[in-house]
Amino acid sequence: MGCVPSRASGERNAWLKTTVLLINPIYNADGNERVAVTNRGSQAGPVGGMGTRENAQGLDLNRDGTKMETAEARSMASLLTRYQPHVAMDLHTTDGSANSGFNMTYETSLNPNNANAQMRLLRDELLPAITTAVKAKHGSDWFYYGGVSGTGDQRAWRSDAELAKPRYTSTYFGVRNILGLLTETYSYASFKTRIVETYWFLEESLSYVASHGDTVRDVVAKANRESIIGQQLAVRQQLVKAPVLQKIVFAPTISVRNPYVADRPYRLRPDGLGNAHVTSEMLPFFGTAEPTETTLAPRVWVVPISTTAASAPAQATTAAPTAFGGARGGAAGTPTQRMMAAVIDRLEAHGIRYSITAADQPFSGDRFKIATNTLDAREYQGSHKARTLTGAWEAAEQTLPAGSLVIPMDQPLARLAFILLDPRSDDGFMWWNVLDAVLGLSPTPAYYPVLRSMNAVK
């Protein structure tokens, strides 16, 4: 919010000429209001307490980008669909590590399926430019989000491979063809320092965008037009090592007594330590992801409607009762009808275009034959249990009934749709139990309930 007065007062006239800002000051309003001194106890302030990571449903909003289970995530997706921003930023404070010397770390979308030009602009131009500017103006070192792990030859600064999944907001931005940026201020830097350096990030990144508006618009427009049909896209990925070592900065922290909770000290890296207390090391950097498994992006995804009742009830894991995303009209209908209603609900939440077939028609494409269908024993983000399928695609010729669901891939959100619908995706509808009305049936179905085709379906 600190950027608003400077813009209103005329200090940022360049922004006024070339940018429109949409500001959500508090994404997790419910969690923000649940202030307690015991929340995030080791974080350096505010010492009088802070809110919770989870919202009122007990869900982490930064895990809701694909399943769309919260009102907050749905509101964000609606805003992105309606306003079509070119750049989006998510501002965080990290959980912290004992001796990182970076007051600010940042990240972009790590998903390997992002448009190449989009990632080049962010990683090769925008982020290096603002990092250099902040170092020159303020003397502060910034780098990509991560932490040191490993010993000996394996010691390296590593990001988190989980961030390649669009359940995380910054990657969700990326697979929607938006230039997504994540900031993670260091939790053991003082509260003042975190606020100030976040302002610097906004100041420099917005100034860059304002002065490179034509480039930004062009990159996003090209990503929206670019067809991924027929490409091999990632469904699983891993971090890879950068070709050159990177300078990683370290600085000590101290334990400080919290005046409100005597037995819960917090960690602090005091302001003004000076260079004498700062060390650095040249380390390998694992900060981008490459595919470990790929598959074909089709022209269309199809969910054939079925009016046949199941022979056994689904052993499904569903969202919490207060969550969004259930089948319209409750649990009525066949398993396929309930599943389709849940899929349509989420497609609409994301803004993904779809259609319903008006008449029976021949279908020629592929179906995924299931070899194994497993459900994780642990609950995650409410009552979800991760589902994983193995198997193989095989050719299929069949009649597609009227009332079937068709999701075309000639649309700007095709990258997101691919991740949501592929049976091997580690962050799609299958993984999040959205298809469990069918996939949870006993005995397990022989085929994945979503078909793909390189042919158009009307």
Name each region found by the language model.
Residues M1-K458:
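Structured catalytic-domain cores with a bias toward divalent-metal coordination
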